[in-house]
Amino acid sequence: KWGKKAAEVMPELVSFSDIAIGNEEDAEKVFGIKAPDVNVTAGKVEADAYRYVAGELSARFSSLRSISFTLRGSVSASHNTWSGVLWDQGAFYTAPQFDITHIVDRVGGGDAFSAGLIYGLLTYPEKQKALNFAVAASCLKHTISGDFNMVTVGEVEQLMAGDGSGRVSR
């Protein structure tokens, strides 16, 4: 209710950006670019379909060097699958999918992904590791009440390494 719709203001903002981050529905709702063979409502979200979306966005916005999407599959309100993709100057990366069976709070999950991706891109030379960090960080956020991701880098890296035990070492 701010006077304009996202589709009216986002194209200009994205034209000045070198990275765009969204969820599985944003490109369609804001830019009219639909991932082929995807049904978000039915929980059918295929990572490779977003290669097409990233290609279309990069063709439309030459400033973009990186484009990333979170991919949520809804099994129920408290059980989701969670992954993400990253297109980086033509290369395409897919993160492992997490099965989050006891969601505490979804609020802040996208912010945690964005923060994790920015941290990952600045910290790790490998783009795959940067994406994996973002997905793991946001996965952990789903287990925390409130919109702040109160986890450490070590805890995120532990989950990235395959430790899904839920143990927190402090």
Could you say what each language-model-derived stretch is?
Residues K1-A91:
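Conserved phosphate/ATP/ADP-binding segment of small-molecule kinases
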Residues P36, G164-S165:
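Compositionally biased, low-complexity linear motifs
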Residues R65, V168-S169:
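Secondary-structure boundary/capping motif
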Residues Y93-D163, R170:
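Conserved post-catalytic alpha-helical subdomain immediately downstream of the catalytic base
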